């Protein structure tokens, strides 16, 4: 397919920073999203739902970069500015609730055109640092960065891991039998323990069944888990609008799949998933700790993995995070990379502090490793570490 000539008159650049303009470009945005096969995280509906419900709007600004050719939208660089820790960061729009980030590009749009758009976003200012994370190896933004005439941003040391289940099983039962004997036994023991409290049912929530009660239950369980961990998340606050709005986007796209595990009518585990491009993606999960002896989260996971394979899906993606259950069941993992760079002196100083802290930490870890490798008598006499007193 022919690319656009990289002349200014061939395309028009725009930076969207207002609610009104964000709403106006919805149809053109989603048309490009459907053509380009983007994930739901890059859809206009997802970004708009996030922007409408995200808390702390006073500390945020939109920076949605667009490339037009006439009335046709050819590329979208969905960015936003957020203030935290005294700095303004340029990052992906909806980064709070998106596991994978990327640019949307028509095949006819060149890397040079996107580079010009990036330069315009940087020139517009308003931020101290850019930090674009969760970049998949096969993502379009990665390809644009690495192109000879591409953006060429600096890689950052911060990475994340996504865990996935993929294989040549034709049925869920085959996948189950491929698990270790211990894993199969743990599943059966878990179900048996749950059945001591009543009938256990695994089910996919019908599309015509209201999701509200399940989402309320999910939020309650998440708040309890967060409190026990000493953390908070605005997404799960009672009455917070973001979670229902995002789930509604999944439902409207026909992608939503909510799985529940019920014990005598009580929901003991929940997984809010969605299907795209032949992959079942596990977006949000939780379980009731009062039923922990039966491992309801593990039972539900093994049930929906089997369901997914039976439906002909090629992969189950647990998305970001290195939780033990994800690593345990994954057959493959991908590393999500990031880029970072300064725009202001304040940003440069912040990066210098970060790099210095990292260098000091690496040096300390190397020193501890060297000491751990020494015989006990030699380690006791290392400089800076007094030898034990003799008695």
Task: Identify the meaning behind each predicted range.
Residues 2-15, 19, 81, 142-174, ...:
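Active-site/acyl-donor-binding loops of N-acyltransferases
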Residues 68, 76, 98, 106, ...:
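Aromatic (often tryptophan-rich) hydrophobic motifs at membrane interfaces
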Residues 47-54, 62, 101-114:
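Aromatic/His-enriched, Gly/Pro-containing loop or helix-boundary segments
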Residues 12-91, 134-160, 168-293, 389-391:
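A conserved beta-strand-loop-helix scaffold within acyl/acetyltransferase catalytic domains
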Residues 122-140:
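ATP-hydrolysis module of ASCE/P-loop NTPase motor domains
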Residues 91-97, 104:
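Residues forming anionic-ligand binding surfaces in small-molecule and nucleic-acid pockets
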Residues 59-62, 125-127, 256, 311-313:
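Short, high-confidence coil segments that cap the C-terminus of an alpha-helix
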Residues 130-132, 203, 317:
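Short catalytic-loop micro-motif centered on adjacent basic/acidic residues
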């Amino acid at each position: 397919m022919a690319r656009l000539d990289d002349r200014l008159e061939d395309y028009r650049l725009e930076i969207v920073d207002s609610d009104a303009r964000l709403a106006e470009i919805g149809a053109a945005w989603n048309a490009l999203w459907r053509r380009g096969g983007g994930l739901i995280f890059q859809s206009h509906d997802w970004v708009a739902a996030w922007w409408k419900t995200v808390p702390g709007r006073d500390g945020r600004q939109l920076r949605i970069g667009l490339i037009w050719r006439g009335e046709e939208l050819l590329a979208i660089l969905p960015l936003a500015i957020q203030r935290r820790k005294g700095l303004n960061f340029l990052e992906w729009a909806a980064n709070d609730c998106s596991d994978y980030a990327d640019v949307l590009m028509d095949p006819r749009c060149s890397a040079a055109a996107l580079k010009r758009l990036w330069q315009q976003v940087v020139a517009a200012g308003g931020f101290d640092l850019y930090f674009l994370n969760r970049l998949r190896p096969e993502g379009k933004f990665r390809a644009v960065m690495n192109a000879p005439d591409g953006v060429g941003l600096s890689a950052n040391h911060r990475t994340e891991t996504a865990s996935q289940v993929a294989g040549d099983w034709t049925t869920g039962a085959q996948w189950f039998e491929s698990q270790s004997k211990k894993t199969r036994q743990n599943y059966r023991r878990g179900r048996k323990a749950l059945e001591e409290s009543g009938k256990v049912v695994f089910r996919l929530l019908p599309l015509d069944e209201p999701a509200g009660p399940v989402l309320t239950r999910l939020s309650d369980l998440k708040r309890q888990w967060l409190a026990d961990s000493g953390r908070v998340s605005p997404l799960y606050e009672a009455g917070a609008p973001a979670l229902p709005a995002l789930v509604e986007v999944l439902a409207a796209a026909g992608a939503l799949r909510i799985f529940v595990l019920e014990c005598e009518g009580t929901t003991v585990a929940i997984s809010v998933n969605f299907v795209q491009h032949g992959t079942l993606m596990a977006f949000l999960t939780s379980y009731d700790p009062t039923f922990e002896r039966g491992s309801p989260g593990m039972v539900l996971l093994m049930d929906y993995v089997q369901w997914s394979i039976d439906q002909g899906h090629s992969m189950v993606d647990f998305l970001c995070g290195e939780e033990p259950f994800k690593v345990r069941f994954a057959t493959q993992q991908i590393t999500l990379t990031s880029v970072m760079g300064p725009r202001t002196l304040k940003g440069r100083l912040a990066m210098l502090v970060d790099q210095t802290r990292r260098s000091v930490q690496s040096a300390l870890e190397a020193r501890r490793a060297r000491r751990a490798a020494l015989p006990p008598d030699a380690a006791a006499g290392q400089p800076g570490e007094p030898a034990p007193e003799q008695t």
